[in-house]
């Protein structure tokens, strides 16, 4: 694991924060910032721009949990959340919010490195899946646009589907554009003439 990682610890309890900090230092991580007060937390996290965020909440209220979950949805970083007690709804909410590791139970410094590694690995795996999903959605949208443009060309120029696609492809190559961009231009032009 990269020892130069910027890590933020969010913990109102200095004793518990020290356990996290000691565990990180023993694992070779020295670039660690402790945020004790949660007021203005999001702005402070953006200012620090950490690689990983560790949040220790001990026994959080529903409001505090929801505040942390909202923050985790926005920051798009590996987040490990430590709590002493939990329930099924909180676990599900943490997963939905994108928390990479939700750790329940005793906070022990010798577990911090493993938890950090797990947190980063799960975040990266989820990010890869999200990227694949985004690419698949984009390809599907492109396919829909291309199909619609082919239909317009087939009707307007009395072409077969293959001929319409070949025309889109040739135009895209000549203009050094993506086929989907040319297809969108065809759709836009057709809508102007309605």
Give the residues covered by each predicted segment.
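Conserved acidic segment of CheY-like receiver
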Residues: 3-15, 20-24, 53
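Conserved phosphotransfer microenvironments
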Residues: 17, 38-42, 51-71
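Short hydrophobic/Thr-rich beta-strand motif most characteristic of the beta2 strand and flanking loop
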Residues: 29-37
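A short, hydrophobic beta-strand element within the central beta-sheet of small alpha/beta folds
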Residues: 53, 77-86
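C-terminal output helix
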Residues: 89, 107-116
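C-terminal output/effector regions of signal-responsive regulators
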Residues: 134-194
